[in-house]
Amino acid sequence: MSVQGFWGLQLVPGKTYSQVVSAPFRITMASLAADAEAGKRTSVSVLVDEKEFVLCTLVPNKIEQQPLDITFVEGEEVTFSAKGQNNIHLTGNYVFQDDEDDEMGASMIDSDEEDNVEDFLKKLPPNASKEDINKALLGLEVDEEIESDEEVESDEEIESDEEIESEEEEEEPVPVSKKRPAEEVKEIASKKQKAEKKEQPKKEKSKKEEPKKEEPKKEQPKKEEPKKKEEPKKKEEPKKKEEPKKKEEPKKKEEPKKKEEPKKKEEPKKKITKLPNGLIIEDIKMGEGASCKNGQRVGMRYIGKLTNGKVFDKNVSGKPFSFLLGRGEVIKGWDLGIAGMKAGGERKLTIPAPLAYGKRGAPPDIPKNATLVFDVKLLSMK
């Protein structure tokens, strides 16, 4: 069962409308605008993966509406356009899975995963280090998945596909649940205290860097003032009346420049997007290059917190956390919130419980119905 919300777009001939899909939606109807000119033929096209396709062609008084059934998923780059003389209205709906279906599937996966993790830990040598355990849990299945993908060209294609699907189901509760074997619960608590101590000097450094940018700006007018005072000493008395005019002009010009520059820099940092499913995406830094898509392997740094500020998980050094985007290897809030990021980009994701760990939570660190806050940074994508 799915939850549906209205989606709509008005196409104007000569203009294109591009986006990276952040929430799946379905187009169900294309219609001519009410003020369409008679006899003017208009076509609707969509560009996907650098290939253009015509969805329909509408003609006033002949074909004014055309039912459609086209769905676009998260991470796809799509561009809509209209060619002709008339405006076109595209309508449809967003599509999200119901919470109850997600929780039933998640509970079955969680129980199976816990059994598999316990069996796997029993097979490890008693002197295995924490780093060996993490690599075994996070890296082993990923390496096997890549190798199986490269070999799927023979008669065993069906069998290898089934193995990949089972591995993805076991990895679904990443990034938190995979790092919680029973032997590491005590170590996580000590890491949380270190994370809180590390965050304080980082905040102090950012505060110190801000006034450093303002100091050279204030020193500029100070250098100009003594020069202006020396000039009237050499000049005659009637020219002293012109001094206040010369002082006022540069001050008026410099003040708006100082105010405009920080405003332009702050605008992209505070870009906030709220999706109909409750996910809030705040772009802190945009990054450079192409946007990441579904199916790409991305490397991430992150800090996971509860709404009260308590840190429950993080990856801030060492090997970045990597996963296949849009393949269900992480919580839904990550698949939706990271899509469209660029290398070096930073975001703050506020993820509601239905897109995280739902009513069950992930004891003991994540309570039931918990809203999670992640500070994420995209390091790489392949």
Swiss-Prot record:
Organism of derivation: Rhizopus delemar (strain RA 99-880 / ATCC MYA-4621 / FGSC 9543 / NRRL 43880)
Region: Disordered, residue numbers: 139-274
Root EC class: isomerase
PROSITE patterns: FKBP_PPIASE
Protein name: FK506-binding protein 4
Family, as annotated: Belongs to the FKBP-type PPIase family. FKBP3/4 subfamily.
Compositional bias per record (Acidic residues), positions renumbered to this chain: 141-173
Catalysed reactions listed for this entry: [protein]-peptidylproline (omega=180) = [protein]-peptidylproline (omega=0)
Protein EC: 5.2.1.8
Subunit annotation: Binds to histones H3 and H4.
Example of a GO MF term: peptidyl-prolyl cis-trans isomerase activity
Keyword vocabulary terms for this entry: Chaperone, Isomerase, Nucleus, Rotamase
